[in-house]
Amino acid sequence: MSVISIVPLASKSCLYKSLMSSTHELKALCRPIATLGMCRRGKSVMASMSTSLTTAVSDDGVQRRIGHHHSNLWDDNFIQSLSSPYGASSYAESAKKLIGEVKEIFNSLSMAAGGLMSPVDDLLQHLSMVDNVERLGIDRHFQTEIKVSLDYVYSYWSEKGIGSGRDIVCTDLNTTALGFRILRLHGYTVFPDVFEHFKDQMGRIACSANHTERQISSILNLFRASLIAFPGEKVMEEAEIFSATYLKEALQTIPVSSLSQEIQYVLQYRWHSNLPRLEARTYIDILQENTKNQMLDVNTKKVLELAKLEFNIFHSLQQNELKSVSRWWKESGFPDLNFIRHRHVEFYTLVSGIDMEPKHSTFRLSFVKMCHLITVLDDMYDTFGTIDELRLFTAAVKRWDPSTTQCLPEYMKGVYTVLYETVNEMAQEAQKSQGRDTLNYVRQALEAYIGAYHKEAEWISSGYLPTFDEYFENGKVSSGHRIATLQPIFMLDIPFPHHVLQEIDFPSNFNDFACSILRLRCDTRCYQADRARGEEASCISCYMKDHPGSTQEDALNHINNMIEETIKKLNWELMKPDNNVPISSKKPAFDISRGLHHFYNYRDGYTVSSNETKNLVIKTVLEPVPM
């Protein structure tokens, strides 16, 4: 068995008289603990280990578990060498001009009531324009225009839906489905009963057997609408099953085209795992292909031109922010801890994929730092740390006092120092945007997270397999969703007073559902690898324990059903009528849930980031779009 090379440091350690109360004093009880050095601000103590084995033994006989994680894929020198011309002011001026021209297009649509737009398709034109700017990631420039368009469309909404134009008596599925989705996402009250009017006598959505482009587009919009269902909406469940089946069959019969690419994307990345920037990049490519085939109207071409320019201007900002992230990671000393996953670039890709507002740099950087700290703690509690070391660290976090770290092994001292300094620095920055001290909120979330991980470490140490309910309640906290969300949103220029936090933070339903989705989805993707590392407890194994004779397939089916139902509950928490907490205040936390879900869409793209996640980094961060 491989041996960890240890440079002798402190040979004594301390245990706390009580691990449960932050007011108890440290009591020095001499006990040997293996130490591992960490590079921090020029002080380097290196350690080497084999990652090809599940465990390794230190020089003084301490057995440690290892995670089999691949190394960092993105060299700091490479990151620092990135450059883009799109940060020049001339590009910003061009974008400003195009924004004005697109506003004029919106304004021309808003004159429809005066008879300047065709009464047979004006509603569809309004909706298509809104849909285009949102999917292309440029809607932040047109919030006023979007509201005017949607108010106009909603004024013609009926219990049977709408037709393509204000003078069209017969409703149609395409316009109704597109309108339903966009209106619901913007907080308008619409009910799924409208889709009952598109069923035949057999209770099925009426459509021909032919896969015409018009019909496919209608069913595609129906599928997109079905993904924002609320609990108990049976017609939405039926619509999702029908439309997904129809679209999969259509892919087998239609030629490869921009339409087939759009179908593939929507089926692959459903609403709750969709990254807006990836969608923008994909939709740019689709519209660009339509441009080559002369299939775009003048207005859409103008919108596409702006979208490409905006994508590349933000790409320039991404490179600068990524350089800052990489410098922080390098200076933290974390590169010298080779038992952890180094995924700072991947986390930046995720957060810049859900928030493309240039002024939200501190939000994005805070998210990356917090997620990387969570990853370090995850790997320390899950694998490398001994149970005695973890007890010490858990108590030290509860005390939140650097002077109490003298009893920690050296590698933990380094981790604690970076954690303490980074969280405090971010809290000071958050005070500028929130106008009050937010540190206590974050500390409470961090203590809960550490406590949940400590409980899981105790389970691993003792070989205990909990019940599903016991594991799940703890696992929602150890998912890290709450702590990954709370600190970053405080950096936004959105006020989060106490009544808003009550709606989105613990113990709200919103927080519970978001944490549940992440824990359940993570376990379905990670349970086999976790078991190989000696982590027996998962939603799958605990379900099988509670249901003797059940199979892994039974457990996965049950958990996938739980995920689908919980997504509907989270949809409701986001979009339910609530005058006190608008959608805009809940959307950042919701989008973080979507982003984290994206990592686990088909596999653990967080731990194994060398496949789809690597391609995501290239497509949405490293490469500009061709102009």
UniProtKB/Swiss-Prot annotation:
Keywords assigned by UniProt, alphabetized: Chloroplast, Lyase, Magnesium, Manganese, Metal-binding, Plastid, Transit peptide
Similarity field: Belongs to the terpene synthase family. Tpsd subfamily.
Pathway this chain belongs to: Terpene metabolism; oleoresin biosynthesis
Principal location class: plastid
Binding annotation for Mg(2+) 2: 378, 382
Function: Terpene synthase (TPS) involved in defensive oleoresin formation in conifers in response to insect attack or other injury.
Keyword Methyltransferase: no
GO terms under cellular component: chloroplast
Cofactor note: Binds 3 Mg(2+) or Mn(2+) ions per subunit.
Induction description: By jasmonic acid (MeJA).
Cofactor(s) for this UniProt protein: Mg(2+); Mn(2+)
Misc. remarks from the entry: Expressed only in susceptible trees.
Single GO molecular function: lyase activity
Reaction catalysed by this enzyme: (2E)-geranyl diphosphate = (+)-car-3-ene + diphosphate
A Pfam family recorded for this sequence: Terpene_synth_C
SUPFAM superfamilies the record matches: Terpenoid cyclases/Protein prenyltransferases (SSF48239), Terpenoid synthases (SSF48576)
Protein name from the UniProt record: Carene synthase 3, chloroplastic
InterPro entries noted in UniProt: Isoprenoid_synthase_dom_sf, Terpene_cyclase-like_1_C, Terpene_cyclase_plant_C1, Terpene_synth_N, Terpene_synth_N_sf, Terpene_synthase-like, Terpene_synthase_metal-bd, Terpenoid_cyclase/PrenylTrfase
Class of this enzyme: lyase
Keyword Zinc tagged: no
Positions annotated to bind Mg(2+) 3: 530
Presequence boundaries: 1-36
